[in-house]
Curated annotation (Swiss-Prot):
Function description: Photoreceptor required for image-forming vision at low light intensity. Required for photoreceptor cell viability after birth. Light-induced isomerization of 11-cis to all-trans retinal triggers a conformational change that activates signaling via G-proteins. Subsequent receptor phosphorylation mediates displacement of the bound G-protein alpha subunit by arrestin and terminates signaling.
Similarity field: Belongs to the G-protein coupled receptor 1 family. Opsin subfamily.
Main subcellular location of this protein, as a coarse class: membrane
Molecular function, one GO term: G protein-coupled photoreceptor activity
Name this protein carries in UniProt: Rhodopsin
Amino acid sequence: MNGTEGPNFYIPMSNKTGVVRSPFEYPQYYLAEPWKYSILAAYMFLLILLGFPINFMTLYVTIQHKKLRTPLNYILLNLAFANHFMVLCGFTITLYTSLHGYFVFGQSGCYFEGFFATLGGEIALWSLVALAIERYIVVCKPMSNFRFGENHAMMGVAFTWIMALACAVPPLFGWSRYIPEGMQCSCGVDYYTLKPEINNESFVIYMFVVHFLIPLIIITFCYGRLVCTVKEAAAQQQESATTQKAEKEVTRMVIIMVIFFLICWVPYAYVAFYIFCNQGSEFGPIFMTVPAFFAKSSAIYNPVIYIMLNKQFRNCMITTLCCGKNPFGDDDASSAATSKTEATSVSTSQVSPA
């Protein structure tokens, strides 16, 4: 074996030289130089510096402006809340452990950080699934006389949390476990060992199939059909120009969010699955650290994309930051005309046969 397995950890280095120590008790500078841990700490500080205000303002602006509280935005608000939770409960811990070069909070802290990192990532994934299904229902109209409203949005939010908890909770109760990964400063699901006494192999397979592959299949199907429907509607002029424009804008925003999610999480999923399928193979700590820390940036890009691509939300954000007055002239009064087109007509539109 090219790694060293302990009671609650796995170090990606053989202990033939006798230098391997518990990541809960000793600095792991034999895995990487101290300056590399400093880079990880600086990166986490940057994510906190950006992630906290961005997600907080997303929540605050949505609560402040009634016209933003539409069914579609419930899922986006849920996403911002989960990201905010990740920043406060996960990133701060990882920043502190990176500064010390090992996971100073012990096994309990590892379970705490691993749980919230997994929960936040899964809420983001299932939120994108809910958004894809909502877009598919509204734009593709698979059901006649169906109106997507507040109750459906709340059900979608509840669904994201149920599915995320179904992935993040089992390791807390003995089906798999959370252990330090990579350079041993952050924690995640144990992809490194089979660990039959905790049925680790079955959990990893369950996680990849149910909580990664199936969501991606649903998202791919929904947006594949959606793109075809939007093109057909544009060619046949079946809907008004304003409705088509609103649907295209919201659809573009969500598709970009999905693309960025894949950019952030697919490398991590690929590396984790590779390690799992090649038990005992040789790999350095950086091999898992880079995709794991890169995946954490997902807590920032979704609200940024939403602010950049949604004119109504952008105007509300500027109005809030400028104490109730938009210096660019697109304040609440001037944007009222576009409110229905960009939000209400898309998220709560009556779906009827074409």
